[in-house]
Amino acid sequence: MDEVTLEVFDYSGSKIVSANSMTGQILAYDKHHDLAAIKLNNTRKLEYVAKVIPRDAIDCLRIGDPVWVCGCSLLHDPFPNSGTLTYLREIIEQKAYLMQNAPSIFGNSGGGLFHGTEGWLLGLTSRVTVTQLGFGVDVQSWMGFSTHPERLYEFFDHQELQFLYDDNDDYYSAMKRRSDRRRDALRSIMLEGLGLQADPADTASPEDKFLDQ
């Protein structure tokens, strides 16, 4: 797994008291959804952890629901902006987004969109609206788009990361499922290369089959 470095900010009330670099390992990523899951290499439990909106609550979202976006606007330290949901399913390049009018600008990308009353994570800020004006562009910071929560669940399920929302699942079970999937996929590819068909009941390795030929 690739290792990355992240910056974690600590607060005392509304004041940032420290900003610490922390390493982490990329568990999974998806270029289509522009999402990644990172496991932090830390021994200190993070005090505040957001919960993803429950899957059965997604259809209960309404235009006008209060929301907050948070991110490092124009490389500033993280700060929140309030607004409301203005469109529940905007399709851009065949991908679904929520639209909100909480001001967002370059630097907010990847920051969370949170429900204003429930505190749920709804998505990640992904796009802003721009208008071409001559040789420049005008940014409509009040027309921001965030990853639709259904896409979060598509990512979690495809990557076997159900433990992020299911209390009956756990990290170690998820890692075993991911390992099993990779093994089965590799086995199918190798068998296909040998002109053989995978048999679910057959536990022999492709190497053993090759030796039998």
Q: Where is each model-derived feature located?
A:
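Catalytic-histidine neighborhood of serine endopeptidases
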Residues: M1-K31
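C-terminal cap/linker of serine protease catalytic domains
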Residues: M1-Y11, L121-Q213
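Short coil-to-beta-strand transition motifs
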Residues: S14-S21, L74-S82
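Envelope-exposed proteins and targeting segments
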Residues: N20-M22, H33-A36, I63-D65, N81, ...
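Active-site substrate-binding loop(s) of clan PA
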Residues: Q25-L27, N41-H76
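Active-site region of chymotrypsin-like
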Residues: N41-K51, D77-E160
